[in-house]
Curated annotation (Swiss-Prot):
It comes from Listeria monocytogenes serotype 4a (strain HCC23). This is Probable septum site-determining protein MinC. GO terms for biological process: cell morphogenesis; division septum assembly; regulation of cell septum assembly. Pfam families: MinC_C, MinC_N_1. Cell division inhibitor that blocks the formation of polar Z ring septums. Rapidly oscillates between the poles of the cell to destabilize FtsZ filaments that have formed before they mature into polar Z rings. Prevents FtsZ polymerization. PANTHER family: SEPTUM SITE-DETERMINING PROTEIN MINC.
Amino acid sequence: MKKNVQIKGTKDGISIFLSDKASILELQQELTQLLADQKQNPYSGEKLEVQVQIGNRLFSEEEEREISTIIHKNSQMKISAFYSNVMSKDEAKKWKENDQIFSMATIIRSGQVVQVPGDFLLIGDVNPGGQIRSNGNVFVLGNIKGIIHAGFEGNENAVVAGKFLYPSQVRIAGKVYGFDSEDYKEVTETDLFSAFVNDAGEIVIDGIHKIRKIRPEISNFQGGR
């Protein structure tokens, strides 16, 4: 008979696998018995971080606490995280929002902050003092003189595309690039650029054509809002 609870060493460290076919009560009982058996649990005396893999199910906060309590009471192991193959409704909603392209046709004026959860397309200008914050990529069909913050929640793979003019500033995740030179006042109408984080962890400004090369997945974007 297949065990509902197993402790295994993986490439990511030690994991406790809990069958998604068993009830929470069965898991609690088998986990307690397994951890209490020194012969079956060679890790009982070690202070290790473990991952708890719960398969195709979700645990409530209370169920996670109950499993955590059993592990802490019967071993020296510390849970680093619970991992599931499925996502909650809130996680699915956030994922869907982050996967969308939001668009506006307007001018972002001084003091204005526009924030979106996914990619953002602006048809218009960003004036000095105006700011765009996006969890994804930002594309501006207009003049950029304000602040563009792509990958707002830490996504360094995000890119920015548009016509950067003095005194614009580009931020990608935690990186910052400021256009503090008067030279950018003379940029022509055809000067569209891309900004991205390179392998050295620095923001690079290059031609618009570079986007497809460094982020080929962007050409597959569909949808809008």
